[in-house]
């Protein structure tokens, strides 16, 4: 029960006043507007919510399966189109290379034939000169004496023989030089044609960048996210088909496409946590050139050996 009676020393007078609200108002009370209650929607049953969630989940999973199947079909179609185009261009390049090689071989055979004809003419002229000198020496020997004429004839014959051998060596050396020069020209023509064809294909065929990206991503050995560096002109195309590239390979969970000015059109560089995979067109072309240059000396040697035998 609260204390109701206080002593004098328990009370302290204050200058401030505290006004207390009346428990009852003596003014005109405002009219309270009656508000009509709105119907409350019934709370759904938890089982119905779970069933709806389960139906949504199944629908979402079916949609994901359909999207994945469609992406795999599109990736397979893209791969087949790329392989067909690459095969067609490879056949075209092979035919062009065969044509150039045939022309170069025909020119080299013509030069070799001319050199052989010139050597035969020189040998015939030398033989004619030798015979004339022998006849002259013989006649001179008869006039001056058999022994002196025979010695003079031997000297002339030895001189002509040495000269003839030198001429033959010069002709053979020229023939080998023609073979080496022709082989070098053939290799240069093939490499030049390859560079031009690859440059045109890389800049004008959108399927080249797609094929290079899929080929490079399939070399990734560990699962995770990777970064793909491409040329500025290929960024938009690669970004549009990013999900198709991910669906076409197994170990790539996420793909980030960035611009790199050091990467030529049609090529790419894949960066992973364990290193990078270089699929630039220039790198592939350089590897092809090295292989051609490694084979070229063998071709020259085999041609020289066959001609010598």
Curated annotation (Swiss-Prot):
An annotated GO BP: protein transport
InterPro entries: Flagellar_FliH/T3SS_HrpE (IPR018035), T3SS_Stator/FliH (IPR051472)
Cellular component terms (Gene Ontology): cytosol
Subcellular location: Cytoplasm
Main location: cytoplasm
Function: Needed for flagellar regrowth and assembly.
PANTHER family: FLAGELLAR ASSEMBLY PROTEIN FLIH, YOP PROTEINS TRANSLOCATION PROTEIN L
Name the record gives this protein: Flagellar assembly protein FliH
Species lineage: Bacteria, Pseudomonadati, Spirochaetota, Spirochaetia, Spirochaetales
Gene assigned in the entry: fliH
